[in-house]
């Protein structure tokens, strides 16, 4: 019984921490994880085939990539 109560308390704490993060901050975290740079103009080599504004990314070199329309 104590284990069940402890599990419920832990899950409530985790849920409250998740809900405490605003949606806008969550989106910013997601975009930064993709490696997008400011103003949706550039993306780095680790961002994959998409940029923040859903434009395609053309690699100019390993370190410099430009988002295309």
From Swiss-Prot:
Secreted in keyword set: yes
Naturally occurring in which organism (per UniProt): Agelena orientalis (Funnel-web spider)
Propeptide regions on this chain: 21-34
Protein name per the record: U2-agatoxin-Ao1i
Entries under Pfam families matching the protein: Toxin_7
Expression sites (tissue/organ): Expressed by the venom gland.
Chief location category: secreted
Function in brief: Insect active toxin causing rapid but reversible paralysis in crickets. No activity shown in mammals. Does not show effect on mammalian voltage-gated calcium channels.
Domain of life assignment: Eukaryota
Family, similarity comment: Belongs to the neurotoxin 01 (U2-agtx) family.
Keyword terms, alphabetized: Amidation, Disulfide bond, Knottin, Neurotoxin, Secreted, Signal, Toxin
Signal peptide limits: 1-20
Leucine amide: modified positions: 68
UniProt GO MF annotations: toxin activity
Disulfide bridges in this chain: 36-52, 43-57, 51-67
Domain notes: The presence of a 'disulfide through disulfide knot' structurally defines this protein as a knottin.
GO CC aspect terms: extracellular region
Subcellular location field: Secreted
